[in-house]
């Protein structure tokens, strides 16, 4: 077998996966003096569990979480960090919770222990995002990569089916773009295909049952673990750039934006992909036209499939495209204003070309 030259960078996070694995958090915190625990109030029972095991004085609970991580929230949380003299960060929650922990790690250089309760995948990456008045800024820094990640399906089992649908589609977007990334490699590529298979299987179960069963949950959680891993390993392209612009600039729900955009972005890229890549998409999504498969998966789970449905205004299409084109980045297909405007028009109306 002949391999093309490739580069691969692995990133070191220790992962605990399985039911009731949350107990590892208390053991890991025994090495620190005081933890800054970010968790919404609905997750307070898990915070109380840590307090019971370690003592109230060693756990500082911060419950404010806002999508897209506004800098004002970071300032508030950082001030509490300093006042309480904490020395480690614990994030129990979804992408916004983990995103706040990452923003604080940038300033404090403290380690992160992440316990994801959605399928966003942020817990496996060195990518951070912060929103200011000028919009959303993203970057990479090794300090924001959680040292430990605990995947406990018990914590995700109560997720509403609607959130499970959009959150798993968010994870699917990472896998999709890793497959056609300009800097992909055999390891990331194969993992991406496997992750996509697991997510699709979980989505089919979710759609059939209408509720998040433990079987579907574990498939989706494993797929999201792989999705986060590959998101960290290779570069993302048009889909992620557009999602950050629509979410950060226009205030749209993060996972819903990912859910809606995917089919239309893959259709935009389709002609630029190699036959082998196209064939692999067809195989893992079990469909002769994968963009349509993604649209059908979202629709079958009751997830949004149009930009209009998630509050985006048609008059903002050109503005969004201009922002996306302002800075160059690698993408399988040449990015043109006309092409991207046409893509968003289709996404707004919910109509693929075929």
Q: Where in the sequence are the language-model features?
A:
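ATP/NTP phosphate-donor binding region
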Residues: 1-87, 307
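C-terminal charged capping/lid subdomain of soluble metabolic enzymes
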Residues: 2, 284-354
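A glycine/threonine-rich phosphate-anchoring loop and its flanking beta-alpha core
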Residues: 12-13, 106-190, 195, 276
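Structural motif
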Residues: 14, 34-36, 60, 87-90, ...
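Short glycine/serine/threonine-rich phosphate/pyrophosphate-binding segments
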Residues: 22-25, 44-47, 71, 96-103, ...
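A short, small-residue-rich loop immediately preceding and capping a beta-strand
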Residues: 81-104, 108-119
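Active-site segments that bind and position negatively charged phosphate/pyrophosphate groups
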Residues: 182-296
């Amino acid at each position: 077998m002949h391999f093309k030259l490739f580069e691969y960078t692995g990133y070191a996070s220790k992962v605990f996966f399985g039911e009731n694995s949350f107990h590892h958090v208390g053991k890991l915190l025994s090495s620190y003096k005081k933890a800054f625990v970010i968790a919404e109030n609905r997750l307070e029972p898990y915070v109380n569990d840590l307090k019971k095991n370690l003592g109230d004085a060693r756990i500082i609970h911060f419950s404010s979480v806002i999508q897209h991580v506004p800098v004002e929230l970071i300032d508030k949380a950082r001030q509490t960090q300093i006042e309480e003299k904490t020395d480690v960060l614990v994030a129990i929650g979804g992408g916004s919770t983990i995103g706040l922990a990452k923003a604080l790690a940038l300033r404090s250089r403290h380690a992160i222990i992440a316990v994801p309760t959605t399928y966003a995948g942020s817990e496996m990456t060195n990518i951070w995002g912060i929103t200011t008045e000028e919009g959303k800024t993203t970057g990479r820094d090794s300090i924001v990569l959680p040292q430990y990640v605990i995947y406990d399906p018990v914590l995700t089992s109560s997720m509403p089916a609607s959130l499970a649908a959009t959150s798993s589609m968010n994870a699917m977007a990472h896998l999709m773009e890793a497959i056609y990334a300009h800097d992909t490699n055999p390891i990331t590529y194969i993992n991406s295909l496997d992750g996509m298979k697991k997510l699709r299987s979980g989505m089919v179960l979710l759609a059939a049952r209408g509720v998040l069963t433990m079987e579907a949950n574990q498939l989706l959680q494993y797929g999201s673990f792989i999705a986060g891993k590959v998101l960290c390993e290779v570069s993302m392209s048009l889909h992620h750039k557009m999602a950050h612009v629509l979410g950060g600039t226009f205030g749209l729900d993060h996972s819903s934006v990912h859910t809606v955009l995917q089919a239309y972005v893959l259709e935009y890229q389709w002609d630029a992909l190699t036959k082998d890549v196209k064939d692999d998409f067809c195989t893992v999504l079990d469909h002769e036209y994968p963009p349509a498969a993604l649209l059908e998966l979202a629709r079958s789970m009751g997830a949004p499939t149009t930009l209009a449905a998630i509050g985006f205004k048609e008059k903002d299409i050109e503005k969004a495209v201009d922002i996306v084109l302002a800075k160059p980045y690698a993408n399988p297909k040449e990015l043109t204003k006309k092409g991207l405007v046409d893509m968003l028009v289709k996404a707004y109306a919910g109509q693929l070309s075929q």
